[in-house]
């Protein structure tokens, strides 16, 4: 193959990759504006497991919180989302500080605390009730037809209960729902590295 043919081949391959990336980027933004999708997100990296005994949901100092890496990770996720064309969003968060801090660090809009996004790790008997409340929250927000993407910051147990899959800290899940806010399908977007 001549040098010119190699350069043409490289150019064509690069152009195809650029087009595919642009389409994927447009697809995420378009999906989040179609009234059938939300972005579920697990909080960024918070070292440890669960919360310390006797924690108080109203006192961040008593909870498991974001570490330095988690704070950088949350900012990187916000940058990645802006790179996908999401510059402003409706953001809802669990009352746990590791979620609300992640939500704030995304820097995509104000954050509203919603109890259905709170962890039920300490009381698994709440799984069905909170999952139903999450579906109602999603339905209610999508019914408003604001066209702003909806981002829901929550925990491992909540995401697993809603869609049946485990995700890592900082991972995002594009979830398609029916008119009642119930899960249909999903695509996982791994957290970008800071």
Q: What kind of region is each of these model predictions?
A:
Residues 1-5:
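N-terminal secretory signal peptides that target proteins for export/translocation
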Residues 10-19:
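Bacterial N-terminal signal peptides
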Residues 21-23:
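N-terminal signal peptide c-region/cleavage motif recognized by signal peptidases
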Residues 26-116, 120-124, 129, 165-194:
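Active-site-proximal alpha-helix that buttresses catalytic centers in soluble enzyme cores
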Residues 36-38, 146-154:
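Generic beta-sheet signal
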Residues 84-86, 141-148:
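Glycine-rich phosphate-binding loop signature in dinucleotide/nucleotide-binding domains
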